[in-house]
């Protein structure tokens, strides 16, 4: 049985860094992916699926949802780790629904929790615009990314809240505090459901 944790949060919430630190520390047990990594990995493998993904990316198009879902499913099922953390997913109501369907069709994957790293828009803006992460980190791009994140957020929160899967973590603290909080939650969940 694969145990899946999803981490969502605004741009600049630190969700990727948090997940990376936890997965490194427990590398015998936990694998961490971001959706972008998974797609790039598939392209690198040179599989037919990878070739399809590359054709969309090369043309600057969004990779269709069913292809993203196939990629995620393959990564989870083929991972040699029991626990999988995926950050930055789901980003939309469509992705959330597609994931739910995929989980129903694959009883060997169990969604343990959706962890939301909560930060204010001010904090997120400060972190993103204050860090040199590449050309797209300017104000307009940040505002667009923030808007894309916030638009479906209530529906996503509600959906997982109803299932008793949503865990909010305060992202305004130091990285050490956030990681400690997230790590103990994940390990406790794994133990509970061992």
Swiss-Prot record:
Enzyme class: transferase
Cited function: Catalyzes the reversible transfer of the terminal phosphate group between ATP and AMP. Plays an important role in cellular energy homeostasis and in adenine nucleotide metabolism.
Protein name as it appears in the record: Adenylate kinase
PROSITE patterns given in the database record: ADENYLATE_KINASE
Record's subcellular location: Cytoplasm
NCBIfam families named in the record: PRK00279.2-2
Keyword Iron: no
Pathways per UniProt: Purine metabolism; AMP biosynthesis via salvage pathway; AMP from ADP: step 1/1
GO BP: AMP salvage
Complexes and interactors: Monomer.
Keyword Repressor appears in the UniProt entry: no
Positions bound to AMP: 35, 40, 61-63, 88-91, 95, 133, 145
């Amino acid at each position: 049985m694969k145990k899946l944790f999803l981490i969502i949060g605004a741009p600049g919430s630190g969700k990727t860094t948090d997940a990376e630190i936890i997965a490194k520390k427990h590398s015998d047990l936990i694998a961490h992916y971001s959706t972008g990594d998974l797609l790039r990995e598939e392209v690198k493998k040179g599989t037919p699926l990878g070739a399809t993904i590359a054709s969309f990316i090369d043309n600057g198009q969004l990779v269709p949802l069913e292809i993203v879902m196939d990629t995620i499913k393959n990564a989870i099922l083929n991972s040699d780790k029991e626990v999988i953390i995926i950050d930055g997913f789901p980003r939309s109501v469509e992705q959330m629904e597609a994931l739910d369907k995929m989980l129903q069709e694959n009883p060997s994957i169990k969604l343990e929790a959706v962890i939301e790293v909560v930060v204010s828009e001010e904090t997120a803006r400060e972190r993103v615009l204050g860090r040199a992460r590449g050309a797209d980190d300017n104000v307009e791009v940040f505002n667009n990314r923030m808007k894309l994140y916030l638009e479906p957020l209530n529906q996503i929160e509600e959906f997982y809240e109803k299932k008793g899967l949503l865990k909010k973590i305060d992202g305004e603290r130091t990285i050490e505090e956030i990681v400690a909080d997230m790590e103990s939650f994940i390990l406790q969940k794994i133990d509970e459901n061992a």
